[in-house]
Amino acid sequence: ENQVGLHYQIHRGIGVHHRAAMDRNESLQVAITVGGSPAMSLAAVMPLPEGLTELTFAGALSGRRVRMIRGSHAPVYADADFAIVGRVDPTATMPEGPFGDHLGYYSLQRPFPFMKVEHVWHRKDAIWPFTVVGRPPQEDTTFGQLIPELTDPIIPTVIPGVKAVH
């Protein structure tokens, strides 16, 4: 009860923070937010280099700092339509999957961490955005096409010597 399974890449983003909390044998405070500005949605799906946060990228895209709400919980994105806040135990897992992917294959069921939900907030008239995922072309294909348009111009400045990525 009051749990949310978390399925993420253990070597990136939240996985790095979770590993650090595990090494300290501490629970990890997490805020899952849904909705808000298009810049935040785009930042969430971008393959950003380590060290460049989604918040920084979204702020750069929108031309202003991302507003956050701070309290006794993890910081929460102020413009989100929904926020689910809780803690991830350093060692507890639950089965997640199988999941279908956009090529028509399924991943295996595996143990993943889960969050014990402490708070759920939502805006009045909130909207839960989603995309239809499946064999291309689907809605998620648009994100895949947009990413190179945004990243191709900056590749040479981020990776010296590389002129293009195909």
Predicted regions located by residue number:
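Charged, compositionally biased interaction regions
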Residues: 36-166
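Internal alpha/beta scaffold segment
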Residues: 2-45
